[in-house]
Amino acid sequence: MVRVLSATKLRQEIEPQWVSWYIKEYYPDAEVRMRCPLGPIPDELKQLYGPAKAARVYRPSRPEIDALVILPGALLLIEAKVIRYMDGLAKLPVYAALVPLTPELLVFKKLPILMHLLLPVRIPWVIAAAPALGVEVMTAAPDWVLKKWEDRDKSWTAEARMRRAERKALLKQLGFV
């Protein structure tokens, strides 16, 4: 599990591991590109650096899909969301629009694009809205992801609020806030 340290908190990025688990379970033999950058690269950069280096230079500015699975006859875009479901619903159609403009994916330009939003549990409003966007909602998660999902509601208990207040006071005392 990737842990990102900032001045005030330790954040866990669980979605990349979860997507890897999902692909291993459901698409074990498929070609997969994790955190695949999408979209065009500016012509100015291609002229200045050449196409390969321009792609590397511009990568931080390009959006990334959690996973792109190359299936026989289709491309599958997978975006996983533990909590921010609206972000996943909104991003997937944009990502699909960027695939034909992505130089690294031009060979797949004519393939149909499927979009899967991976959720830990069924969320009724997401399932209701997804078909209008061409998104299929998939609910699959290992136990450790379900635990994270269940723990999210506990962050607003009196006990959790008290722990946050104590932590904030300590950070302030140490000069971080």
Mark where each language-model region is.
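Charged, terminal alpha-helix-loop-beta segments
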Residues: M1-V177
